[in-house]
Amino acid sequence: MSLTVDSGQTLQRCLALDIGGTKIASAIVKNGEIQQRKQISTPQDDAAQAMHQTLARLLKEYEGQFDYVAVASTGIINQGILTALNPKNLGGLAQFPLKDSIAQHTDKPIGLLNDVQAAAYAEYQLQNPNDVQNFTFITVSTGVGGGLILNHRLLTEPNGIAGHIGHTLADPNGPICGCGRRGCVEAIASGRAIEAVSSQWDDPCDPKEVFARFRQNDEKATALVTRSAQAIANLIADLKIGLDMQKVVVGGSVGLAEGYLSLVQSLLSELPVVYHCELESAQFGQDAGLIGAAYWVKDCLLQAKNTGVVYG
């Protein structure tokens, strides 16, 4: 991402947008506090044209109330364009020119990043920077995603793809992932992966019921949840040994399910000590993307004041 900023510009008020597959949240973020929060459904029919109209309407509604725009979005933000490892996840929004669409309606600085990267940056604000330089946020939900912070810096990188750790290899003989590769972590650990198995049982159920049965020590449910947790524990071990990760925070509907993180911790503790890593549950809720995007874009803009351009 590249940004330009006037050295005299104030950056107190952010218009933050969080674009998901089913909803778009918007708010003014000032000093880390959410104000004027709104939520609408993500356009599904004639999605691209409807998204242009939705963004125009939101920018009009908040006109005059913000100094910059920060966007957290599902998928990958590549040079301001919305894409994904599995374009089917975006429906009619694949290759949507997100930054240009917003720029048509404001002359304020605009920054964009993946929603899990944004959530990672929000969670990192709660850490002591003297103790934690290398940090990962993992969301285990419908899919598996991540945000990586190394030496205090959030990794987004030129193509916006950094942090897609759900698409690292867990089992070369595992199921085909939505990205087209066989055996990704997401294809084994995610809520979608859990349901792919539990829906085929003689007594089929959804992931919520799987976890209810897991807490009742049901054998099949316990084996399925353990399979998911083992993939996440191995992923964390790889992050620790590969990047000297100091802390991992886990969120998402699966990641925050009762008993899940403690199981991941137990499985991780069975590995040699060099693979151990401090684990915590995510603290931010549904507004992590809004808050994280606002913090990150502001930090990028402040960094730019000396040079006029920053690359995030």
Predicted regions and their residues:
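Glycine-rich phosphate-binding loop of actin/hexokinase-like ATP-binding domains
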Residues: 130-188
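Conserved NAD(P)H cofactor-binding loop of Rossmann-fold oxidoreductase domains
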Residues: 74
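Active-site glycine-centered loops adjacent to acidic/histidine catalytic or metal-binding residues
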Residues: 18, 115, 141
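General beta-strand structural signal in soluble alpha/beta enzymes
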Residues: 110-114
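A charged helix-plus-loop insertion that forms the helical arch/lid used to bind
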Residues: 82-95
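Residue-level detector of high-confidence beta-strand sites
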Residues: 37-39, 85, 157
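ATP-binding/phosphotransfer module of carbohydrate and carboxylate kinases, centering on a glycine-rich
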Residues: 1-68, 77-81, 102-107, 125-132, ...
